[in-house]
Amino acid sequence: MFKRMVLVALLGVFSSVSLSAKSLLRDDGILVSDLKGMKSELSDAPAWVFEDAKVPYEEMGVAYIPVNNKYLGIEQATLNAKLSLIVVFHEIMMKYKKRFMEQFHESEQTATNISYAIYNYLATKIQVAYTYTNLKSEVAVVKIKLVGCQIEQIKRYLKASVENLNDNEIAYIAKVAQKEFGSVCALR
């Protein structure tokens, strides 16, 4: 009973804080595709802000800067970029999920757990490469990329994270990971 009361109180505090903070944030969003149309406003921006990603598994994120705090803008832009990259990872995993389930007679839950384990591993390998802020336009731009990914680490991470995977299943997943992430993930 006491835990429930504490939980309700915390939920109320978080709700009121988020509702009061919402008025500080802009309702209109900004997209990476909007940056090319903002060249005059962002005239001091480095060239990478307006370029498309040249390297696989490199994403950009953009956000408005709330309450003149560039660090909050950078944080939000980084989260937006990470979400974009996770969507890319998810699309790759969905492409192989059904085939994996049929070939190894595994449940959908096991396939989902594998996906989550790989997302978690890859999320630890995402680094911010560049940041740019413009306080006048209230815009923060971040470029992130996948760095230090290793297929052997993915295999170890899977063994530790997903129960009952045998060596053949892990080898198959490693082969798929090498095929999809080979340009940015080393074998060792």
Model-derived regions, located:
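Domain-level marker for long, solvent-exposed, non-transmembrane regions
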Residues: 20-188
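Bacterial N-terminal signal peptides
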Residues: 8-16
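Bacterial N-terminal signal peptides that target proteins for export
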Residues: 1-6
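Short amphipathic alpha-helical "recognition" segments used for binding
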Residues: 7-8, 79
